[in-house]
Amino acid sequence: ALSSAASDVYKRQYQVIAPKSIDDILYEGDTLHHCVNKTDTYFDRIVSKESYILFLREKENPKVPFYTLEVEPDGTIRQKRAEFNRQNKDIDKVTSFLTLWQKEIQKRLTQKDRKSTEESRKLRQQNYQEIRDKHVVVHGGTFAGELLADLLEKDLMDLPMESAENEESPTEIAA
């Protein structure tokens, strides 16, 4: 667990924000040069409430794309990607902040959220199995030649409910 001082640093450094419109998501994908705006998959998941697109920003530059997040209803982070689908050198600090953010989100879940989460997890697992069975490989960039399912599973930040309930978390994190 992070010390209180460390969590305060992360709270001052980052914020998670929701896009105001589809145009925000399209701009994010164009600016960071990744796939969030190049496929209907993410928009279909938003409509079905399987997952959502959120943006991680540095507080000092809230309008500048930093990381794009794909997040399930319970705060499980499926993907966190910076420019060109990479993760920057600061990924450990980013991941620490996102873990704190997840704990805050999980404290606020309703019964309806929890039910949506079960369906979202099931769909994610089915998708991972499907792309693994088809041996879907990344074709370009840093991860060329790697199995997509392996990359997605490695990026997954799934915080067990028990962990969220039993550990201390900061009182304020932008949601």
Annotate each PLM feature.
Residues 1-175:
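Catalytic-core elements of nucleic-acid end-processing and repair enzymes
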